[in-house]
């Protein structure tokens, strides 16, 4: 009886430990942090104590930070120097760095993939050389600053291509050559160990769209081959399309893994605490989750479970949980943050990362 009494708590602790360690990457994108701090924003932990945001995240189970990198933004936001400063703090807090290369001077997404100033818009050979050199420069700069990088995404949400007009989806050979050049910019850099190389598309729940892209870019007759990249990342937002069900995400991630043999991650996701007038109906299998702090916890746990139960499912990143000057995060939902926008205090939902 004594043996059972001792073993049972140990088994409970072991199971909890295994559950907590199921995802390799438990992350958040906090790219806006330095801009927020410049505006005078200070963050507080759940107990109301002022602390650096990266320390608050680490204490709540976050082990990796995603950073967007722009080429030559007019005001310096998210440029290489900005990201080196942020990454030094991330590493000092004991978390890994994931660089999200937009290959643009501004936002890159399915609706915008603007070629940086000074890069070619009419010669693919010149453009791919510029992509290679820039990617290697970014990686070498991190290496020279003593900053290890775990993941480099070569493009952001590139389902509709990248570096327009040459990289538009009417020419998958161009897209493939751009991605090949970017991948070798990472491989030929001085970073050691080498980062994992990721391709990242939006609408991660839409298997047909994912398959359409990868089948074409890998069969275009250009240079890109499967061995050029290691990871497939997807965005999964619940508030842009009622078809974005958890069931559809499950199918898509499993098919991505089985078809292309890559580890898979959800690298952007959010859940609202306030959404009185959503622009679109929410997916049917998410309607039981409330728009609340508790709802954020439930949502992240459900998505994390789907990733963890997918063979090769290794990570989840919440997008901009602390961007208090932009609580809607571009959606029709008024507040998607894990930090209260008015008090700057961490919400209890932030601790969900310690459970996934």
UniProtKB/Swiss-Prot annotation:
Disulfide bonds: none annotated. Glycans are attached at residue 133. One of its GO terms (molecular function) is glucosidase activity. The active site is at 157 (proton donor), 268 (nucleophile). GO terms for biological process: cell wall organization; pectin catabolic process. Its EC number is 3.2.1.89. It holds the Pfam family Glyco_hydro_53. This is Probable arabinogalactan endo-beta-1,4-galactanase A. It comes from Aspergillus fumigatus (strain CBS 144.89 / FGSC A1163 / CEA10) (Neosartorya fumigata). The lineage of its organism: Eukaryota, Fungi, Dikarya, Ascomycota, Pezizomycotina.
